[in-house]
Every structure is written in structure tokens, then in C-alpha cells.
Amino acid sequence: MADKELKDIEQVAQRVADAHGFLHIDDKTAQLMALDAQIAQAGFWDDAQRAQTVSKQASSLRDTIDAYNAAVSLLHDARAAHELAGEDP
């Protein structure tokens, strides 16, 4: 049973790794950093329409990155739980 669980965890790990690529997490992180820098600039909020557009873009990027990071965290938790379960007598 433990071998099947480990295999399942490794399959999920591969899917999460694949998601990193097709979701372009590194690019989205760089884009978010650039947008956050724009948002932090003095006068950014003077143009309400532009500010709203940039804020929505940043929010969308943040949502995608946060969802990916949540999946990574769950994967780490699953691996840790599997390791702990293997230590029990």
C-alpha cells in the first residue's frame, strides 16, 4: 500500500512540476513584481482607469501564483505525511 501511495505522490509531483511550466509561474512572478513596482510609484493612483487595469492584472497573476504555491505546499505536506506514516510501527 505504501508503494502505491508513494507512486501516487510522485505522479502528483510530476503534474505540479508540469503545471509550473505551462502556467509560466516564473514569468508571472516577474510580471507581478513589475506591476507591484508600478503600483508602489508615486502618482500611480492619479489615473484611476489605468490603476484599476494594472491592479486587476496584478490580482489575476497573484491568484494564479497563490494557487500554484498552495498545490506545492499540499504536495510537501503529502510527502511529509507519507514519511511520517512510514516511521510508525
Predicted stretch roles:
Residues 1-89:
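Charged, heptad-repeat coiled-coil alpha-helices that serve as long linker/dimerization "arms"
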